[in-house]
A protein has these predicted regions:
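ATP-dependent small-molecule kinase catalytic core of the GHMP/sugar-kinase superfamily
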Residues: 130-257
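Short, conserved micro-motifs enriched in small and acidic residues
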Residues: 68-72, 108-116, 245-248
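ATP-binding N-lobe of GHMP and related small-molecule kinases
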Residues: 1-106, 123-130, 165
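DPxDG-like acidic metal-binding loop motif
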Residues: 32, 108-132, 152-163
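Short amphipathic alpha-helical face segments that pack within enzyme cores
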Residues: 76, 113-121, 249, 253
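Gly/Ser-rich catalytic serine loop of serine hydrolases
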Residues: 101, 105-113, 147
């Protein structure tokens, strides 16, 4: 019997969010990338664990990223997408190589890129045919702010927001992250975590803004790492009316870009 393989290349851009007045709303994709090269034997290889792909990683953060499919963020997201879609495991023998150009913890959306790469990986290897809107639903179950992941998924200069859902859908979209991406124990087998919470439909929505081709982005990357959660802790709980009004005026200028 002849053996062939399916190959995929998935490339996800870095992003910058909170652009100008667009806090938690406006994101911009940048020309640094997380690239996955994926090979799936066809017919599937009988070697190795059913849902334990062979993972290699180069580039930024190569010495920090776990190569276990149950610990790596990208493959955990992919497995979440697969299991929500009725596919319980990765194809046996899957080989995944990741090359990353996006610095970690520097405000360039490294975690958002990893999440979107996982959604695209699950869709590709499971042959799911998910719509872009459904992919965003899965991403928003992991990254609860839409700005980075939306820009990483659709590219360009975008505004995004969370829709107002009915109570049952709101509850489904608000389950703890520990239930969406559980911490797999060392002895986790293929039956562990088989029934993850399904994302409701239409969690997020986005619109594209115009972007003049003459505009170029310059990113200044600090030498220190700072998590998004830590950075958000310095923000005040409320803002003066005059600041909100000024922000609205600035927001109206997006159309001139």
């Amino acid at each position: 019997m002849s053996t062939h393989s399916r190959s995929y290349k998935i490339r996800v851009p870095a992003t910058s969010a909170n652009i100008g007045p667009g806090f938690d709303v406006v994101g911009l994709s940048l020309s640094l990338y997380l690239t996955l090269t994926v090979t799936v034997p066809d017919p599937p290889s009988a070697s190795g664990g059913a849902d334990r792909p062979s993972i290699s990683y180069t580039g930024e953060g190569a010495d920090e990223v776990p190569l276990d499919a149950y610990k790596n963020l990208t493959t955990r997201v992919a497995l979440y997408v697969l299991r929500c879609s009725g596919v319980q495991a990765f194809p046996p023998g899957l080989i995944l190589h990741a090359h990353n150009e996006i610095p970690f913890g520097r405000g360039l959306g490294s975690s958002g890129a990893a999440v979107i790469a996982g959604v695209l990986l699950g869709d590709a290897v499971g042959r799911l045919g998910l719509s872009r809107e459904r992919m965003l639903d899965f991403a928003l179950m992991v990254e609860r702010h839409p700005d980075n992941v939306t820009a990483a998924l659709v590219g360009g200069f975008v505004g995004s927001y969370l829709r107002e859902l009915d109570p049952s859908a709101t509850q489904a979209a608000s389950v703890p992250l520990s239930e969406v991406l559980p911490e797999y124990p060392p002895d986790a087998g293929p039956d562990w975590g088989r029934d993850p919470p399904q994302p409701p439909g239409g969690i997020g929505h986005y619109v594209r803004f115009g972007w003049a081709k003459e505009i170029r982005a310059v990113a200044i990357i600090p030498r220190f790492e700072l998590s998004t959660a830590t950075a958000r802790e310095v923000l005040p709980e409320s803002y003066a009316r005059k600041d909100v009004v000024r922000t609205h005026i600035i927001d109206s200028e997006f159309k001139s870009l």
